[in-house]
Amino acid sequence: MAKETTARSILGYQTLPTTALIALIYVVAFFSVLVSDQLPSIPHPGSKKLKGFDLDLARRDLEHIAARPHPYNSHANDAVREYLLNRLDDIAWGKDHVHLDNDLRSNGSWASPKYGVYFEGTNLLVKIDGTDDDPHTQIPRGVADGVLFSAHYDSVSTAAGATDDGMGVVTLLQLIQYFAENRQRKTAIFNINNGEEDWLNGAHAFLQHPWANLTSTFLNLEGAASGGRPILFRSTSLKPVKAYDDVPHKLRVRHPHANVIFSDAFARGFVRSGTDYSVYTGIDRHGPAAEGGLLREGLDIAFYKGRSRYHTRWDAPAYTEGGERSLWSMIDVARGVGVGLLNPEDSAKQKSKPGVYFDRPVVLALLWAIGAVLKHNAGSPPPPPKPTVPHSANNASAGTGRPGASTRQPTRSFGSNEDANSERGILARIKSVSVKNVLITVWKQASFWIALIVTVGLQALLAWGYVAINPFTIYSRPYFVLLSFFALSFFSMTLVLQAAFPSSPVKHAIEVREQEKTTILLHLHLLSWIALLLSTILIGKSQVGSFYVVTVWYLGIWAATVIGTLQPILVSKRADDKGKRRARRSRSASTSSSSSSSSSSSSGSDTETERPSTQPASERTPLLFGRANGASNRRKTNSKSKEDGAIGWWIAQVLLTVPPVVMLVGQITSIVLEAMNQTLTDGNSAWSIYLLTALLATMLVLPVAPFSPKLHRGLIFLSAAVFVGFTIYLWVVFPFTRQDPFKVFFQQTVSLDREDVFPMNATGNAVTTHGPKIVTELTGNPAYLRRVLPYLPSSREEDITCSPHEVRTGLETCRWKSNRLAPFPGGKDPWSTWDSDAQRTTTDVSFFKADVTRTAWASARFIVQGRNTRNCRLYFDPPEKSGVRVVRYVVHGGAKGMQPGYPVDLVNGVQEIRLWSRTWGKAWEVDVDWETPLGTGEDEGQLAGRIACEWVEYQSAMVDNGSFGPDRQPKIPALEEALTFLPEWVAVSKAADGLVEASAPFTVV
């Protein structure tokens, strides 16, 4: 008996064991998620993992590549390209199976629904022949089986590009060296492309190259943040994801990081970012070719943490999150996945189908076909039975179902009237059903749903409080915000359920708590079944894989509910068997002692009646003695201070319902917070982020609901204190820091007159009297943008106008005149007779020259030449304003026709043509055809718009190679002012491809 009491105090369904076990599960689950999210350490020198790699060389490569900003339209870009070309030439030298192509031939035109592009590629390509392929055979596209590895070496104009995409390029250099010395089965093609930051131009240029026809699978390396662990951003299907496992054990990725939630977010527009993945797969195609299926299967692997430093000066080697460990993590993942892609197991038998993938904390990645999830969900058990509140919840003295309780019906006394007793029993039960009892039953039945409604309502109210008071507090303290939501959810859920199921006055009534737990489990089962039904519909219609957690949640709840339903039956049967054994022992004991009892003296009998019998009661036990013994036992039981509780059953239920959900939801929560908390400055809605955090916090608490009546009340007070303390702190704290800065987007525009651009005389010199109109634009979230402007001296004495941004939803653009901070394009003026630009003023500096000639009634030729730039544009007024739409364009000297899958939209036309050249100061000749909308005459409408050129170079980011004299260095003083005077909690990024855009209007006459 003592052993049973000790075991019950430790393992019984009591307050302290339940609280301790659940608290331990949460601590272990959260700790495992945080530990698995840490960057792996770099292997020690001489490790087999490092064989074939040189991390010191990789670090030096990164320092060369990310020394300064190097966008496509910069001279620093040429320097990076030259460095990479020399490195690749050294690797390929003396190896016949390694082929290097310095691609300066791939030109092409392609269009999106809104704009058209002409681009001249400068990609660096490497082909390493596979052992199973014939290098002299040009394989048709239909049977192409090579693997494409891709990263871009250009950066944005405001960042050195350590993670975007310097680490990706350095990783490819290491892979080229590794695969050159360790040939794989398939052919590997590496596209170190240029122009990705200007809307994926380098990937499009690769499609123009013959080697593009040799690939069927790809691995794209990207950086959408500022370091940390690279994650599997998205995948076309499970087929390429299996590359994580199709590798020898010693090369396998030991710490994979993947979750299908990113792929779903990309597909539905929640992630405002684009990578070469969309070009290689062809998912962004339009027109007739859009229905042709995927061009290639593949994976997108990228960094995602620290987005506030993304595309800013803090994306540099010195500020990368994780430093060299982050670089090694990317190399390790790319090597493991690359080997798997190049050496697949039975690739011909593998089918391309969408799937579910996520990495379990501290374990390898898990794959699950969406079809299997859908099939399982469709075949899941039916909805649970209607929950019922056991009578013992209202009558604590009931003994039915309690271990050891007798189930024998009471014996009728001699001469009793059964019918009369039955009628009196029915009337007694009817009278006992009072309004109070009915209300108590309804309250207990509805308590879970009331708790859920209260919790959801309070979570929504808290989200409103954050959005209204301090919406950016999640920007730098996401886990504090999560803790605030979690504490409130736990407080409200537990408080309501403990009020519905208070502590029983008879603490040893085990069946009370067990059946209360089962009641809540049944309601939770119903909720999970509804969620499973909705997720099945979404999976079937939209192929949403992120609902895998609902399936896991439902399975755990279902199993725990089955245990709770079977427990009373099994316990009752065991109690009946135990009672029968006791009865047999009692009869045997009574028979053996009958002779001695009859010979006992009266005094002895009196003594025996005074001492309670230790034998169990039976049908032969004297009635009065049994009553006295029972009363004594009840008095002793009621005097006990120890809490009773069933052993074993509840532990299995806790392990089935709590750990799987907490670990999976905890991992999703960590990814969501790290990836989305700093997207507010990109224009994302604060409501969506806070409501999503509230939903995840509620899901973390829901598994505890069935056991909450047994949790220690101290946890309620603790959660209330945590909620109040952290919420007040988060509402008043300043949300931005140097590590998590507020991001603003910069651009300066120069509006030129027609005579500044179009030829006026033979020399091309056209001097204006009033000069250009120069405006500085700063774009950002309106909540803090206007607090930033006073830091800039040029804005203090000017009229500032602000309006919603035309493209970036949720952001605002403020403008002011800044002629005193006029930009200078740099280089030599090809149209001027002046010996030096130092002799000229800012009002007569030439930016570009252009000419427009009408060649037919609906055709014109544009000639554009920019000064010290490789990027110009043609803007056309929308059809609603001009009455015409541009339906065709051809650039002289470029490839004929449009890239397959990217034609001009003949219904809406193009409103912009972006021109990119690999040579400086090139003069583009562009033929344009237009149409008038249906129902208008040929003479109606007039093609008009703007001609513009872009510049991205400024003094603090220049390459000091002596190519420019002091009077010919490009300058953007307004940007230098922003970089100098803005506080440390503000970071500057580009607003468009050009930091400076000079434009002049045109009209085709």
From Swiss-Prot:
GO molecular function, one term: metal ion binding
Keywords annotated in UniProt: Glycoprotein, Hydrolase, Membrane, Metal-binding, Metalloprotease, Protease, Transmembrane, Transmembrane helix, Vacuole, Zinc
One GO term (biological process): proteolysis
Enzyme class, spelled out: hydrolase
Annotated positions for site Transition state stabilizer: 310
Bias kind Polar residues: ranges: 406-419
Residue numbers spanned by region Disordered: 379-420, 577-640
Keyword presence, Lipoprotein: no
Active site: 196
Cellular compartment(s): Vacuole membrane
Pfam families tied to this protein: Peptidase_M28, PFF1_C, PFF1_TM
Superkingdom of the source species: Eukaryota
Residue ranges, Vacuolar side: 36-353, 470-479, 541-543, 666-686, 735-1005
Gene3D superfamilies found in the cross-reference section: Zn peptidases
Cytoplasmic side: 1-14, 375-448, 501-519, 565-644, 708-713
GO terms for cellular component: vacuolar membrane
Coiled-coil zones: none
Catalytic activity, EC: 3.4.-.-
Named cofactor requirement(s): Zn(2+)
InterPro entries: Fxna-like_M28_dom, M28_fam, Peptidase_M28, PFF1_C, PFF1_TM
Protein purpose: May be involved in vacuolar sorting and osmoregulation.
Family, similarity comment: Belongs to the peptidase M28 family.
Name assigned to this protein: Vacuolar membrane protease
